[in-house]
Amino acid sequence: MFEDLTIPRIWPIGAILFNLLFLLIAIPIEGYIYHRRLNFDKKTSIFYAIAVNSFSGVIGWVIFFFVEPVLPVPIKAELINYIFFNIFRSTNTQGVLIFTTFIIFFSTFLMKFFLLRLFVFTLSEDIGKKQEEPQPFYRQKVRFISRIRLQDTNLVTTTLIANSLSYTAITIILLIRNR
């Protein structure tokens, strides 16, 4: 699989620049939503937005590069035409594109949620600190479970809102670009 690994002679500069543009659009929008809804300070919310979008972008490209070689030839041809020339040759490609867009949106949402949850848990300042006043075990367990449930619900809705707004902004830019 990796025997034919060479640097390509033709670079999809348009796709690379649009990916950079999408990151530059998504990070401030999602950082603002994290700041407002999760009550992070601005620096922390932007850090989480950068981390979540960077990791999800890298994971998305890795998935793309593993899926692309197994695609049927007509879909590969349409993909190459769209990436390099911004045109579709086939008329039924738009249905596949809409279906693929929904899959990408929800998989990105799930990826961002789990990444944000991982980052919030691992980068929390409360980990490793001693509690000043020990509480009874049962009370402590109930508080911890209720806090985790509330935090998960809040993270899910916040991630969904942030992802939806950033995808909406990106879609508007794509519509403006194609006119």
Swiss-Prot record:
- Matches recorded under InterPro entries: FraC
A Pfam cross-reference name? FraC
**What are the transmembrane regions?**
10-30, 46-66, 96-116, 156-176
Its subcellular locations are: Cell membrane
Top-level taxon of origin: Bacteria
What UniProt keywords apply to this chain's record, in alphabetical order?
A: Cell membrane, Membrane, Transmembrane, Transmembrane helix
How does the protein's chain sit in the membrane according to the entry?
A: Multi-pass membrane protein
Q: Which GO terms describe its cellular component?
A: plasma membrane
The record's section on NCBIfam families has: filament_FraC
Describe its function: Involved in filament integrity. Required for the integrity of cell junctions in general but is apparently not directly involved in normal differentiation and nitrogen fixation.
Name of this protein: Filament integrity protein FraC
Organism expressing this protein natively? Nostoc sp. (strain PCC 7120 / SAG 25.82 / UTEX 2576)
